[in-house]
C-alpha cells in the first residue's frame, strides 16, 4: 500500500506523460530534465533537482489518474498483485480466483482494457516514486538504499522483519516485487543523520 500511495503521488507526472505521449517521449523528457537541472546549478537561488520539484508541483493540478476500483482495492487490501493473462488463461484465472477467495482472505477483479493499461503503467512508474520522494524531501531525509532480493521458489515469507535497532533508522520503506520471478525490490530512505555505510 505504501508503494501504491507513493507512486500515485510522486509518479503521477511520469504516468500521465507516458499515457499521453508514449514511452518514446521518455528520452526527450530526461534530456529536458537534465537541461533544467544543469541550468538550476548555475544560479544559487534555484533549488537542486529543480526539474523534479517543478514536475511534482505541476502534477498536483492534474486530477486523480487511477481507476476508482484500483483505489477501492487499495483501501481494502494492503498488498496487490497484478496478473496479466491472455486467451484461455483469462477464464482459467477467473475461475481459479473465484474458487480460491471462497475460502481465503482477499479478493480480485477483472480489469477492463483501460483499467488494465493503467494498472500496468502504475506498476511501471512505481520505481520512480522512490527517487522523486527523496528529491522533494531531501533536506529532511538521509541517504537512499535499494536492494533486490531473490527468493527460493518455495519461500512463503517475503516480508522482512527488521530488528528495531535497524528499523528505527529508516524513514520510509517501499516494496514491490515480481512474484513469478520471486524477486522483491526493497527501497529504503534513511532518517536524516544516519550513516548508510554503517
Name each model feature, range by range.
Residues 1-198:
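Noncatalytic alpha-helical scaffold of FAD-dependent oxidoreductases
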Amino acid at each position: 500500500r505504501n508503494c501504491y500511495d507513493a507512486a500515485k503521488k510522486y509518479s503521477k507526472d511520469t504516468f500521465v506523460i507516458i499515457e499521453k505521449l508514449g514511452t518514446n517521449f521518455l528520452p526527450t523528457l530526461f534530456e529536458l530534465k537534465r537541461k533544467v537541472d544543469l541550468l538550476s546549478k548555475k544560479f544559487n537561488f534555484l533549488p537542486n533537482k529543480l526539474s523534479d520539484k517543478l514536475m511534482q508541483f505541476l502534477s498536483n493540478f492534474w486530477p486523480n489518474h487511477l481507476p476508482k476500483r484500483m483505489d477501492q482495492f487499495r483501501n481494502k487490501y494492503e498488498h496487490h498483485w497484478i496478473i496479466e493473462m491472455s486467451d484461455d488463461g483469462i477464464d482459467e484465472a477467473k475461475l481459479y480466483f473465484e474458487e480460491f477467495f471462497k475460502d481465503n482472505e482477499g479478493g480480485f477483479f477483472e480489469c477492463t482494457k483501460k483499467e488494465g493499461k493503467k494498472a500496468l503503467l502504475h506498476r511501471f512508474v512505481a520505481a520512480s516514486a522512490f527517487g522523486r520522494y527523496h528529491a522533494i524531501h531531501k533536506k529532511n531525509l538521509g541517504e537512499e538504499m535499494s536492494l533486490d532480493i531473490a527468493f527460493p521458489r518455495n519461500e512463503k515469507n517475503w516480508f522482512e522483519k527488521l530488528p528495531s535497532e535497524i528499523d528505527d533508522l529508516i524513514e520510509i520503506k517501499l516494496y514491490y516485487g515480481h512474484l513469478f520471478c520471486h524477486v522483491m525490490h526493497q527501497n529504503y530512505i534513511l532518517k536524516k543523520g544516519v550513516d548508510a555505510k554503517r
